[in-house]
Structure formats: structure tokens, C-alpha cells
Amino acid sequence: MKFHLEVSLKLSGDAANAEGDLAEFFEKQAVDLLKKGAPEGMGAKVAGWRITGDQLEIKIESDRYVRAHDALLRLRKPLANLLGRKHRLGIRGINVSRFEIQIESNRQITHRIPYVRESRYEDGLLTLILGVEDPKRGWTWMLENRIPDRIVNLLEEKLQSYGGKAEHWELLWESPPREFKFSGDPTQEMVKRGWIKHGSARGQWIHGPQSTHLFRTFERIVLEEILVPLGYREMIFPKLDTWDVWKRSGHAQGVYPEIYYVCPPKSRDPAFWEEVIDYYKVTHEIPLDLIKEKIDYPIGGMCYAQCPTFWVFLQGATLPNDELPIKVFDRSGTSHRYESGGIHGIERVDEFHRIEIVWLGTKQQVMEEAERLKERYKHIFEEILELRWRMAWVTPWFMAQEGRTGLAEMEGAGTIDYEALLPYSGNWIEFQNLSVNGEKYPKGFSVKAQSGESLWSGCSGVGLERWTSVFLGQKGLDPDNWPDEFRKRFGEMPRGIRFL
């Protein structure tokens, strides 16, 4: 990887009298500064410089060890001290005339990358030429906010994805084989019996009394077997996630294709909307194009992962030692994901119901709680639901974004997927997960412990649609075929709604 940077520092006055001091600086001090921390023979170098009136023009060439933009930032402070102390000159701004990044690659990139004005591919080398896109955010902002580094990381991620790098999956435990009582599609059978009907939106279902009672039984099992015994407290998390929440949680790096966006109206004034109202009254049609003009930019999206909004409750706080670990859960509303062509029955939907379990504390507390949860889940799946299921370690979403996979890099953080076999398709489906997220959320939301010890957190989502798909897919809809322990908790089947 190579970098070439041509930059002009705007000074507060003519710098001709400073030429001698600058020459000495670039010949001695700058050389050491730009090699610091790099292997021998590596780093950055000033390939040329000159003074033109109140402009100090510098050319920097470098490798990956001291990138050119980092080299410039290393030079800025000592240059400011030299020019200010001896020549009463200040640095007023940074303007980049050329910034190239060259990286080895076996292909051209096919997608536009922000702040990349031009790209070319030749002889196994991919060259990116950077440019400023937002006039409000010039080169100083780009360099100080490490935009070039993020571009390099994004480029490496894309080149990796072109190679088809797969998610890591490692089997941890598998239940013994069990006899299945049903071999059909549970969703089709639920529709046939009037337990559920399609809602008006894609990937949405209306649950009748029978299906709802099944959901509530699963909820009660989770409460009685996990949440109450382990001391979890119930909260209500917001179901609208703003951009700031997703930036802090890390979801803003890649959530865009799957979220339902929320756009507020530009005005609450009824007169502003009168044209829309009148159009509908006359045509009985919704004027979507007109509405589009009257709504503002999205402020975020509908609930996607459920736990991120909880962290706003703790944001910026210092927690007393005796308050840890904190253990809470939320079951107050739906989550929404745009599944595109992947929707299928109640297994994969756009609107779903979930109990979100969150815990945080010291690393030891979080790891110990994860083990307790795993034991309780195993008890439920083995002794109450009697499922054919397995546990696997998979690459957590946040580690996948950072290009890390495998148990060797987990260092205590990681995700356990719980998968069950669907007899009608022969496929294993994820119906439950448990994640130890390390310091990610406490750091992202600036949550600290009184002791100064690093805080960790974990979360686990109980998806009621997935539990239903798996349970009915293996046991069927006839309660006589259900395990005794589950039937005790389920009780009587409620009467459904009849139609003529």
C-alpha cells in the first residue's frame, strides 16, 4: 500500500523569511517524526516542499506504516510551533491538491466510494484519487476525522467480500435425535386452521387467539425459567432508533438495506397538508408523490435490533459498583426488518415479536451470566420443549464488520446461535441467539464503572415467531403431540374466530 499527498498549508503571512528554519526542520526533525513507530526502512518521507508567498507546499510519500495523512498531522504541530515562535506566523488552513492511495488488488472496484473522485486499475494495482465532496467539510475535517483510513478499511472490506469470505461457524453442542410428530409447513397449517392471517403489509401476520396464546406461553416460560430466577428487571425500550443511536451502537456501518426508515412531516400545520387531504377526498387515492415532497429526511428507523435504544438510558453515566451487574429485559413491541425476497411464512418476516434480554457488568460478571443463560436455555429446549436443536459459535455482526472471524480472535466476546431442524424442509434454522459483545456498547455510549474497570455487556433475543416455527414444525399443531411439560404450561386451547 502506498500514499502520495500534495498539500498546501495556508499561513497568516508571507513565509519567505522562514525558509532557512524550514529547511533545517525538514532535513532533521521531520525525518525522525515520520519514521517513528515504523519498521526500519519504512514510514513516510517529505518528497519535496517550497514556499510560495503565504503558502507552504509539501509533498509526502508513504507506506501503510505511517500513512501520508498521519504524517501531515504529525508535522502540523511542530511546524506551528516553529513558525509561531520564531516568525509570528500561524497555520490558517489545509488544502490538498492531490491525494492518491495505491493498493494491490486483483480487480477493479465496482461501487462508488465516498470521497473518491476517481479510481483506476492497472497491472495489479488499484489507485484511488480522493476529493472533497462536501464544501462545509474541507480537507482539515477529512484528515482530522481519519476519512482516508476509513476509505482504506472500506476498500479492503469490499475486496475481501468480492473473494466470498464466509462467516465462521463452529458447532458447540447438539441434542440427541428425536422423533418428529409433524412433517408439514407450520405456517401453511396455521393458516389452514385459522390461527393466523396475512396482515396488510409485506412480511406481516395477524395472530389469532390460538397463536397468541402460544406466544404468551413461550413468554411465560422465559419469565418463569430465566428472567425471574436470574433477577432481571423489566423495562420499555423505544422502538424508533435514531441515527445517533445506530452510530454509537455500530449498526450505522451497514444497516441501511434492512431498515424501515422513519421520516417526519416537514410541518404539523394542517394548511401545509391541505393539498394532500383534498386530493384524497376527491380521488380516494393516496398521493404518494405529493406526500414525498412534504416529508423530511429520515431521522432513523423502526426498531431493528431492540437493545441499542436501551443504552441511551445509561449514556454518559458512571455506575456504582454495587449496582453491577445490571440485568434488564424488554418485551414491549415489535421489531422491523426489510427482508426483501427472503420472507417465508412466520420463519422470516418483516415484523416480529421478541423478548430482548440485556446484561452488563465487569467482564467476569458478563461471562458468568452468559453461562447461566446458556444453562437455562438448554433446560427449556431439552426438558420443556424437547426440541431437536444445536448450538454453534458464529462471527458476531460487529466482528464481521471489522473483518475478524474465529474463536481465536473472540477473547471472550462472541455470539452463540441456537439452531433447530425443520422437518418439512430438512434445513436448520436459527431460532435464538446469545451474544457477549465485550466493551462495544459501554464504550459506544460512554458508560463507566465507579471502580474504573472496563464494562462489558451481553444481549439475547427470544424471537417468538422463530420459537413457534421450530416448535410447531417438529411437534405439529395438535396439543396431544406436545411434550407434557409444555402442555401443563399451555393449558386449554382458546377458541378461535369462526367465519361463514
Curated annotation (Swiss-Prot):
InterPro entries: aa-tRNA-synt_IIb, aa-tRNA-synth_II, aa-tRNA-synth_II/BPL/LPL, Ser-tRNA-ligase_2_arc, SerS_tRNA-bd. Pathway: Aminoacyl-tRNA biosynthesis; selenocysteinyl-tRNA(Sec) biosynthesis; L-seryl-tRNA(Sec) from L-serine and tRNA(Sec): step 1/1. Its cofactor is Zn(2+). Keywords: Aminoacyl-tRNA synthetase, ATP-binding, Cytoplasm, Ligase, Metal-binding, Nucleotide-binding, Protein biosynthesis, Zinc. Its EC number is 6.1.1.11. Zn(2+) binds at C307, E356, C459. It is an enzyme of class 6 (ligase). It catalyses: tRNA(Ser) + L-serine + ATP = L-seryl-tRNA(Ser) + AMP + diphosphate + H(+); tRNA(Sec) + L-serine + ATP = L-seryl-tRNA(Sec) + AMP + diphosphate + H(+). Consists of two distinct domains, a catalytic core and a N-terminal extension that is presumably involved in tRNA binding. This is Type-2 serine--tRNA ligase.
